[in-house]
Amino acid sequence: MSVVPVVDVLQGRAAVGSEVTVRGWVRTRRDSKAGISFVAVYDGSCFDPLQAVVNNTLPNYQDEVLHLTTGCSVEVTGTVVASPGEGQSFEIQATAINVVGWVDDPDTYPMAAKRHSIEYLREVAHLRPRTNLIGAVARVRHTLAQAIHRFFDENGYFWVSTPLITASDTEGAGEMFRVSTLDLENLPRTDTGAVDFSEDFFGKEAFLTVSGQLNGETYACALSKVYTFGPTFRAENSNTSRHLAEFWMVEPEVAFASLDDVAGLAEKMLKYVFQAVLNERADDMKFFAERVDKDAVDRLQRFVTSDFAQVDYTDAIEILLASGQKFENDVSWGIDLSSEHERYLAEKHFKAPVVVKNYPKDIKAFYMRMNEDGKTVAAMDVLAPGIGEIIGGSQREERLDVLDARLAEMGLNKEDYWWYRDLRRYGTVPHSGFGLGFERLISYVTGVQNVRDVIPFPRTPRNASF
């Protein structure tokens, strides 16, 4: 007798006639007049539960089996048999069922066997993984993460663990969480009355990182091809379906690479990870297509077979102006494209994923390479039908004098970036990279619109429960 996951039984990897044990939680219990109970046992290894057929001849049938409710944890031992009923190919004919844990009060159990609103599930985030929806999201999230690591490994990239605590503002926007051990009720002060951060833990101001990019560049300029994959933080007071204060980012950096090189990398990576989900999580994707977004599977299949379009920002503005479409946000050269503009380009005009390149320098970060026209930088956004921007990237500015000028132009102190500037002083090379918001990616794949529902414990303004 061996302990096996539910998925092995349902997919036929446990031989018919073999004796196995499965462990999990009760989804439902149905009793027949013939003295047989059908207990659906779920262990999270796949979307569907396994049906255990329990006969009333078991010694604990009356006292325990007939009292099982949704959420009880059980260990079921039995024989794998072909299922005569619809809905599953295999089931277990139980020879023993051990109740590991009871639900204290089934009437008040927060995850009772009914459909719950997505808003309610956020209030019980510690229990919501037990639902079909969040369980499926968790498995897809895992598959996407593994596919990302696998893609980069197969293509010769090294994973770099960049720091979560930093003294640098990658985006130059100032929306950072401060890290401090100072006593807020007794702050040390300088002669001018400012907070004296030299007395703080790090001897200077420190923050939670908004991006691993700058640190990633240091390793790209030694190992050639690297990527970071970890949490990032933005103290942006935005209560929208697209924003989180804590989220995960995938950020490759490539030495000797142009903007076009990383645009090609982005296309290759997205198609790889989407195909992995289609291949490995068909059961979960079927659920999303049936219950969340009927286009979920077809959207990914179209994506992996599409050729990416490419367009300069200036030409994209002309396309929008000539569209005859009435947008909520006015269109003019110099604006940052809004979601409605991005989706028009991807869904209506190109009808395919599109890479928009060469944005105005005034709406982009200091580290992006200045183009010869002096007005634009070598930046790109990958726009996907159905969501808009899914990746943002650029060729990095490798010329020290130009980088210094950009820092000054944006009011940033170049001394704070002394180590970043050193990369331009000692064997500088053209290099490029991009950032992919992992939760935005999961939202696109699953059709779950709010990013708060695709991360285990969302962190948003005035919300840090659990």
UniProtKB/Swiss-Prot annotation:
One Pfam match, given by its short name, reads tRNA_anti-codon
Q: Which PROSITE patterns match?
A: AA_TRNA_LIGASE_II (PS50862)
According to the lineage, what is the superkingdom?
A: Bacteria
Q: What is its main location?
A: cytoplasm
Q: Which catalytic reaction applies to this protein?
A: tRNA(Asn) + L-asparagine + ATP = L-asparaginyl-tRNA(Asn) + AMP + diphosphate + H(+)
Keywords in alphabetical order, please: Aminoacyl-tRNA synthetase, ATP-binding, Cytoplasm, Ligase, Nucleotide-binding, Protein biosynthesis
Enumerate the GO terms in the molecular function aspect: asparagine-tRNA ligase activity; ATP binding; nucleic acid binding
**Annotated compartments:** Cytoplasm
Q: Which GO terms describe its biological process?
A: asparaginyl-tRNA aminoacylation
Similarity field: Belongs to the class-II aminoacyl-tRNA synthetase family.
Q: Its quaternary structure? A: Homodimer.
PANTHER family, from UniProt? ASPARAGINE--TRNA LIGASE, MITOCHONDRIAL-RELATED, ASPARTYL/LYSYL-TRNA SYNTHETASE
Q: What is this protein called?
A: Asparagine--tRNA ligase
- State the species of origin: Yersinia pestis
Q: Which gene encodes it?
A: asnS
